[in-house]
Amino acid sequence: MRTFIFIALLILAPVLASFYGFIHDQMTFSISEEFFTKFRFNNYEFPHSWHPRVRAGMIGMLNAWQTGIPFGIVLTAVGRIHRNTRKLLFYTFYTFVLTFTMASLFSIIAAYMPIPTDIAIARQSMPEDILDPIAFQRVVQINNFGYVGGIIGMLLGIGLHVLLYRRDKNKAIEKST
């Protein structure tokens, strides 16, 4: 059963990440359609007959599930320190939620951070015909901060696993004495 839970968690991480990516890219599409229509869509070969929001969501899913794989591997592997299978399942799920929460929080912070109005350097990496370079850069910033938040969330998740393991171990010692 423990092996089944371990494998299920490894599968769950990229699935949850896909949902996160879909929602994340729907929100960033609202900020800058140009980021997708003039930049991201060129990197993916989705049918042009699809609605732009559907294509944006699919891009978010494709990018996020790939990020969910290493996060899931690390958090699930560290979760194996818990001897109890139920704790492995629930504590690892908590770390997944923590990771997605941190990624979301950092993305939200980035959405409200000022973008420099002198955007000449950033313009070099943009397509030429961008009408709203500030919104475009805001989406770039949100994406970058989301990844940083995910990494910080994963590190906090590792710490949470260790903290819960020590807490449970101390409780077991107290019970036995």
Segment roles from a protein language model:
Residues 10-25, 93-114:
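Hydrophobic alpha-helical membrane-insertion segments
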Residues 30-35, 107-127:
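Juxtamembrane non-transmembrane "cap" segments at the membrane-aqueous interface
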